[in-house]
Curated annotation (Swiss-Prot):
Positions of the catalytic residues: E188 (proton acceptor), K230 (schiff-base intermediate with dihydroxyacetone-p)
Pathway: Carbohydrate degradation; glycolysis; D-glyceraldehyde 3-phosphate and glycerone phosphate from D-glucose: step 4/4
Residues annotated with Phosphotyrosine modification: Y5
Family as reported in the entry's similarity comment: Belongs to the class I fructose-bisphosphate aldolase family.
Protein name: Fructose-bisphosphate aldolase C
Species assigned in the record: Mus musculus
Residues carrying the site annotation Necessary for preference for fructose 1,6-bisphosphate over fructose 1-phosphate: Y363
Molecular function in Gene Ontology: cytoskeletal protein binding; fructose-bisphosphate aldolase activity
Recorded name of the encoding gene: Aldoc
Pfam families in alphabetical order: Glycolytic (PF00274)
Lineage: Eukaryota, Metazoa, Chordata, Craniata, Vertebrata
Top-level enzyme category: lyase
InterPro entries xref list: Aldolase_I_AS, Aldolase_TIM, FBA_I
Keyword Acetylation belongs to the record: yes
Gene Ontology CC entries for this record: mitochondrion
UniProt subunit comment: Homotetramer. Interacts with ATP6V1E1.
């Protein structure tokens, strides 16, 4: 095998590694505020608010106006394209609002899932066309990391070898393109929680998918120290009759990661996958208390599980903005503790305990 020409200089590698480590500083995680216009329609309709650009801006402002308390628990915020170019009520760009808190700005760069022919309803993710140019522009506009989501589902016949291979290679192409532009790629192979499969089946599939992803990243010469992984936790399917404890979920999750994710990867930022706010915090806490060695930071990259209570408090009313922002800060602080294994539970049986599951979830 001939020696491959190094794709990145030592300076480029250092920049990528520094960005990745900053995002997953102990006790910090990611706010995923990258819901597409279509996803925001679902969120806003739940509270009876019209899905307009201005209402989306006002809602993002609720999250982004959080005070300096979030600095110690949020290391990065993932933006949607529209939000990257919006401003707050005072005319300050949202990007600057976030950067002024010492938080890094990320951008969702995929263009959604499309059917994968020759499979039983499986998908691949589009958006590689023009990605190089978009990454170069996003870097100029303040983004230091990116996110790309691939989706796999568990059934009797899925995920197929074809879907696993295709999605792993798409993620690797995306990661390589990001790194050439000084952007840290968050690699997100989400295995949906739809179905009645048990914990063991999800663990097996998660291991197979992650093994394929890291093989593809190696094939594409991706610099692992300058990446982050955004996987699902290993959980039973939503229709599974067996209930598992956070400790069982933690053991299955950490075992799957230990078997597949190289220690060179600086951090694993879990998606919440429709868990309730409280469940997502308790499971993350259990993962960080798991008695197995864990060479990576294990933290959060939550959307709904950081925002649900804030959204309910806001309800589209300017007068509620302050209270809604407080709800977001409270949840962010709880997850900051969970990322260190120091969360004791909120004892909140209310909104925070409500399932946020959406069948066949698409952003």
């Amino acid at each position: 095998m001939p020696h491959s020409y190094p794709a990145l200089s030592a300076e480029q590698k250092k920049e990528l590694s520094d960005i990745a480590l900053r995002i997953v500083t102990p006790g910090k995680g990611i706010l995923a505020a990258d819901e597409s216009v279509g996803s925001m329609a679902k969120r806003l309709s739940q509270i009876g608010v019209e899905n307009t650009e201005e209402n989306r801006r006002l809602y993002r402002q609720v999250l982004f106006s959080a005070d300096d308390r979030v600095k110690k628990c949020i290391g990065g915020v993932i933006f949607f394209h529209e939000t990257l170019y919006q401003k707050d009520d005072n005319g300050v760009p949202f990007v600057r609002t976030i950067q002024d808190k010492g938080i890094l700005v990320g951008i969702k760069v995929d263009k959604g899932v499309v059917p994968l022919a020759g499979t039983d309803g499986e998908t691949t993710t589009q958006g590689l066309d023009g990605l190089l140019e978009r990454c170069a522009q996003y870097k100029k506009d303040g983004a230091d990391f990116a996110k790309w989501r691939c989706v796999l589902k568990i059934s009797d016949r899925t995920p197929s070898a074809l879907a696993i291979l295709e999605n792993a290679n798409v993620l690797a192409r995306y990661a390589s393109i990001c790194q050439q532009n000084g952007i840290v790629p968050i690699v997100e192979p989400e295995i949906l929680p739809d179905g009645d499969h048990d914990l063991k089946r999800c663990q097996y599939v998660t291991e197979k998918v992650l093994a394929a992803v890291y093989k593809a990243l190696s094939d594409h010469h991706v610099y692992l120290e300058g990446t982050l992984l955004k996987p699902n936790m290993v959980t039973p399917g939503h229709a599974c009759p067996i209930k598992y404890s956070p400790e069982e979920i933690a053991m299955a999750t950490v075992t799957a990661l230990r078997r597949t994710v190289p220690p060179a990867v600086p951090g694993v930022t879990f998606l919440s996958g429709g868990q309730s706010e409280e469940e997502a915090s308790l499971n993350l806490n259990a993962i960080n208390r798991c008695p197995l060695p864990r060479p990576w930071a294990l933290t959060f990259s939550y959307g709904r599980a950081l925002q649900a209570s804030a959204l309910n408090a806001w309800r589209g009313q300017r007068d509620n903005a302050g209270a809604a922002t407080e709800e977001f800060i409270k949840r962010a602080e709880m997850n900051g503790l969970a990322a260190q294994g120091r969360y004791e539970g909120s004892g909140d049986g209310g909104a925070a305990a409500q399932s946020l599951y959406i069948a066949n979830h698409a952003y």
